[in-house]
């Protein structure tokens, strides 16, 4: 299944039913008066968050949604049946924007959360409503009100406690495989990861946190190089970032310079994300002898003047991973909550959302999305 995280849809609520024009006609009651009932309301449209969904791919095949219209009123003061409400299932973590005004309508963060996005049309009054002392036999009625219509842009942002950052082949996917049950693709070439992966890291029987792995960044990503910053938005809800770096890159590059380059890309994309707590994780310690690996680790930390926590690990062998996981678990309760994306101003320019969406939907990433990861 392809991973789709932005779509456009059109929604319309149901129109209200028309009121009825009717008069009571029974034996021995020749002038029974008006008894036309009101029309029923139309159906409203709701978005409902569902935890079993993890992509917006279904909306690529159906873009238009309409709720049922209300039924017309009838004689004997009978009100028309209301139209059925329409509930559209979306993944937990979906942001809903008005596509015309770019206004944020809601953020569906919790299982079962409902958001009204198109209110139903009101049912029209029947002629009974217009009866008065001066109008004993009214023949006027009211048509049902029109339902609301709007174009929406749905944007999925994954829910995770911790996010992984790093260059391609830094070992992010290997780390998430080592500490969770997630099984992202791992291979010895750049951009093996083409879409985000989530893994649940279980520390104890009832203690766990969620780790997010996104495709690797490269210098120039904020300007579209590589896979660009398309997936950085999925780290917007995290409380802690782990900056993974290969301590012995095959291209001979300086690990400290690689980290500085990505720090600049992160700041260019979102100052809010760049200011988030970030730990340094130096990976692939198994490639060097023990003392040499420790010396290289200290050299990198010194060159960066790194003051936050730093860890030396080997995701391939598992060395140091347990200590890293335990430190994260201890730190998470004291970390501030992630910035509310509904209040954040710097997560990319919403004015060019249409262009970004068209470019994204034109891509053909034939990658299987791991449904069983979380």
From Swiss-Prot:
This is GTPase Obg. Monomer. GO terms for molecular function: GTP binding; GTPase activity; magnesium ion binding. It is an enzyme of class 3 (hydrolase). Residues 337-374 are annotated as: Disordered. Residues 360-374 have a biased composition (Acidic residues). Residues 160-333 form the OBG-type G domain. It is found in: Cytoplasm. Signal peptide: none annotated. Residues 1-159 form the Obg domain. Mg(2+) binds at residues 173, 193. HAMAP family: GTPase_Obg. Belongs to the TRAFAC class OBG-HflX-like GTPase superfamily. OBG GTPase family. Its cofactor is Mg(2+). Its EC number is 3.6.5.-. Gene3D superfamilies: GTP1/OBG domain, P-loop containing nucleotide triphosphate hydrolases. Coiled coil: none annotated. It comes from Acidithiobacillus ferrooxidans (strain ATCC 23270 / DSM 14882 / CIP 104768 / NCIMB 8455).
